[in-house]
Amino acid sequence: FLYKFLNDKFLYEVQQADEKLKDSENVEQALNDMSEEDYEMLLMLLPPATAKLKREHFISYLFNHKNDEKFNALFDSTLWDISNTNLDVFSVSTGSGDKIRLFDQNLSQNVTESNRRSDFCKAMIDKLVTFSFAEAFSQKYDFFATIFEYLIKDYNKDFGKYAEYYTPHSIASIIARI
């Protein structure tokens, strides 16, 4: 979910930053066709609170490689690289100064059966590629509220109509910056 949000937010912001991209039918292809120098210049024009993504971070890139052997390793390394690339903007420091990153280093390791990890990552990418936040970025309302309510609707279902939950400060800080 967060990966998709960052990806779509990035694409929205590059369209705002570059007039040529505003009318592009395929923004990602236009970005892929840019020279490395032009791409780096475009990244400098983005608002500070926008994640900086490399072209290989795009969801479409992962989607096009989902049938590669060990896809889960590509998926994990992509999220980890996004975390490291944007560490100064999207991280929270602990009391001892350690940085808490956006994504865990090996997210797919949470799937117990090692032979199912790539399938899990493929299924996630298949779902993410069909959804878009694009319209939400120009709106001025809290679209997260509905999403969180949906995600946690069954969490505390026996104690009232709406779920009761606690968002840790580190997560709330990251969400607030996004």
Map each language-model feature to its residues.
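Non-catalytic, mostly N-terminal accessory regions of nucleic-acid modification and defense proteins
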Residues: 1-178
